């Protein structure tokens, strides 16, 4: 695997992303998260900041439900979820993705739609927010 459960324990913050699969996170990510019972029991992720992002092949392909499906286990772990506030101007103008729940991208069925400037701005804002929040939390334990 590209990441191991121990990496979650050692991270200062988590950006969790998945393509949408019928309104849910992809099965391999779900399988990975389902294996994190030891971290849940120990509280290893409690208090760490996290955000979620996704992409879909169709405009109404389940972006928000996918983001929510990734948020639920993070909440069970006691992580601090960061959304995208409406103070981000691009959230009001984007036509290709983005939600208060997290950054999204509508890639098109063939994956041929480029990331718009609004989508890029929202992703950068989310990354900046995670970085700024992770730094003060880094020494929490």
Name the predicted role of every residue range.
Residues 85-141:
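Glycine-rich phosphate/pyrophosphate-binding loop and the adjoining helix
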Residues 1-92:
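Helix-loop-strand module that forms the ligand-binding subsite of alpha/beta enzymes
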